[in-house]
Regions:
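Bacterial N-terminal signal peptides
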Residues: 2-11
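Sec/Tat signal peptide C-region and signal peptidase I cleavage site
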Residues: 13-17
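Amphipathic beta-strand/beta-sheet edge segments enriched in Tyr/Trp
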Residues: 26-32, 36, 208-259, 330-336, ...
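Short, well-ordered alpha-helical segments
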Residues: 30-76, 169, 203, 253-265, ...
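N-terminal segment of the mature soluble domain
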Residues: 48-73, 137-197, 299-323, 327-329, ...
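Signal peptide-directed extracytoplasmic domains
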Residues: 63-145, 156-158, 162
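A short, hydrophobic beta-strand-centered structural micro-motif
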Residues: 79-93, 180-182, 196-227, 316, ...
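C-terminal soluble interaction/assembly domains
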Residues: 244-254, 265, 273-274, 279-387
Length: 387
């Protein structure tokens, strides 16, 4: 198997992706909590904590401001979840236990509850509270981590359960899919501990492309053991494209290492994907490559799945191209960026093609920049039927 997922449940933050460029994160709306019993008061408190966690995952905010809408919602969290199910933590796998939201602060109780929240209700709450929106289609981040210990340097893989569990908890907290390399023969031939430690980004770029990861982390940490406790000193680098950010840590636990790395990865994605604003705008879009009713249905289903798209109106059809009007919270530039980043669309490959389209009159085509009765800019994108 190419990807070694950090979790074993297909509903978890380290699930395999059909399209690694933009996984649909269904588990964003599911939260597990330890509870002492099945009493209503404890369920209310657990529901409140879980609602805050879902809001954090779907807005990208580490701390949720207590706006009037949020405060009112916290008084009745049951309005936002569709069901809750109690379960025994000992009856589930260790990876799922590690992702129980309050696992670090709760005693190892014999009872836990899973809340399944309604995505539409949460979406409306986010709008009412005037919070930003982070869509559920999220790219994976690959984590290359090398540890310098008394025994030498080694790359972290799935056998190091302490690190895996810490990364799993933090990825679940932020709602981010994080992968670790399999370190099979192909990886080992290309990436050694020296490559990660030396930050040879040309080799790491090549190795990360194998996993179709647009974003990756490089962690280089020296490990010191004092009285049975391990302390980590070193640097995280978050990289995508040709740009990167770094952060230095000194003498911290691996939990802090994991938290910092996942937060850096999340912020790098949020800088491109977080949608601000509460005003819906109309954008004109031309989508090419829609050659059948099946492709048209797939396109509409895709748009309906996007949190920041409120409506789609078909204006005109010419050949395999559709002229659409989209109602969205995102501005035009960000809308285009989000659609292309997700991997289902691509920009026209040749500027000449775009220029030729712009010369078509609205009566015979629709790629001209002027629509009847109003001046408005159009964006032309190619639908990728192979994704």
């Amino acid at each position: 198997m190419l990807l070694l997922a950090l979790g074993v449940l297909l509903s978890g933050p380290f699930a395999m992706a059909q399209n690694p460029q933009g996984q649909v994160m269904d588990w964003l709306y599911e939260v597990d909590q330890y509870v002492p019993d099945q009493g209503a008061d404890n369920r209310l408190e657990a529901g409140q904590r879980s609602l805050l966690r879902v809001l954090s995952r779907t807005t990208g905010l580490v701390s949720i401001p207590r706006t009037p809408a949020v405060t009112q919602a916290l008084s009745q969290p049951q309005r936002y979840y569709g069901q809750y199910v109690y379960f025994s933590p000992s009856a589930v796998g260790s990876q799922r236990r590690q992702r129980i939201d309050n696992a670090k602060i709760a005693n190892q109780a014999d009872l836990a509850v899973r809340f399944s929240f309604q995505s539409e209700a949460v979406k409306q709450l986010v709008r009412q509270a005037k919070l930003p929106s982070w869509w559920s289609r999220r790219p994976s981040t690959l984590a290359w981590i090398v540890l310098d210990t008394a025994q030498g340097r080694e790359i972290v893989d799935s056998s190091q359960t302490e690190m895996v569990n810490a990364l799993s908890r933090e990825a679940a907290r932020r709602g981010l899919p994080v992968l670790i390399p399999s370190m099979d023969l192909q990886d080992s031939l290309l990436v050694s501990p020296a490559v990660v430690w030396g930050r040879f980004t040309d080799l790491l770029d090549e190795a990360s492309a194998r996993y179709q990861a647009q974003y990756y982390l490089v962690g280089r940490f020296s490990v010191q053991e004092v009285l049975g406790q391990r302390f980590y000193t070193g640097e995280w680098v978050a990289r995508s494209g040709n740009t990167e950010d770094s952060r230095f840590l000194r003498g911290v636990s691996f939990e802090e290492v994991a938290r910092t790395g996942v937060d850096m990865a999340a912020q790098r994605i949020l800088d491109r994907h977080l949608v601000f604003g509460n005003t819906v705008s109309q954008h004109d879009l031309v989508v090419k490559g829609i050659g059948s009713l099946e492709a048209y249905a797939q396109l509409l289903d895709y748009f309906e799945s996007l949190e920041f798209v409120d409506g789609v109106t078909l204006q005109e059809i010419t050949g395999d191209a559709l002229a659409l009007s989209l109602q969205s919270l995102a501005g035009l530039d960000q809308l285009r960026q989000l659609l292309v980043d997700d991997g289902r669309f691509q920009s026209p490959e040749a500027e000449a093609e775009a220029e030729a389209d712009a010369e078509i009159d609205i009566g015979t085509g629709f790629s001209e920049l002027v629509l009847p009765g109003r001046q408005q800019t159009k964006t032309v994108l190619q639908w990728r039927s192979d994704t």
